[in-house]
Amino acid sequence: MSALHGKVAIVTGAAGGIGRASALLLAERGAAVLAVDRAPEVIDTAALIAARGGRADAVQADCATEKGVTAFVAQAMRDFGQLDIVHANAGILGAFAPSFDEGPEAFAETLRINLIGPWLAIRAAVPHMGKGGSIICTASVAGMRAGAGGVAYSASKAGVINLVQTCAQLLSGTGIRVNAVAPGLVETGMTQMLFDAARSRGREGKIGQLNPLRRSGEPSEIAEAVAFLASDAASYVNGQVIAVDGGLSTSHPFAPRPAGA
């Protein structure tokens, strides 16, 4: 029997990248999946799951508004009658350059999507989850170390890390676990411009060279960690952040820029 047979999962940000990889793998492991994204390509994710023999539905919604989140949780309950797994993955990169040029509106929007969105998902899902439920949020190595992302993005992902730790404590005694995965550099739609820029300059070989594995990650590798946390194999893992980053977070690989350079 598949590890997630009989379970129901919601995956946000499922139109592509890590979210799509997570939705596909959870379905492959036996879960019924509600794929959610504000991009219309989320329908393709559900169709791909169905074509592979899985059970899935798709909802196009803003994953960081109370109305949108309440609606897709209700949709999962209507479609499948239960809720066991939530992967709160939807996010944006915001301004990548670590500078003060990003305005307050853009900063707030990054926090809204990357931090308030997961909080809303947790709050809406918990009343429908029972003992053995698993919530996984997508954080980032940028939330663990400085220098791996822009100011707003890094702050939002640091917030996600504390969010899962605090919610794990808040849900003490319920049997619901809350954890996070912290990806390193992974080629997705969100990071595509970084990869394209490196390739256009003939520096493709430099991508991912700051971690000990000397390569970037694949969305499927992050999905494997999500599937583990969603399963009963992780039944004693709670309030934790699993870095899936090739070892980037084990050191400080960014050389400081000399003053005046």
Where are these regions (language model features)?
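Substrate-binding pocket helix/loop in short-chain dehydrogenase/reductase
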Residues: 97-99, 103-108, 207
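Alpha-helical segment proximal to the catalytic Tyr-Lys
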Residues: 127, 169-173, 235
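Short C-terminal tail/terminal secondary-structure segment
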Residues: 96, 238-261
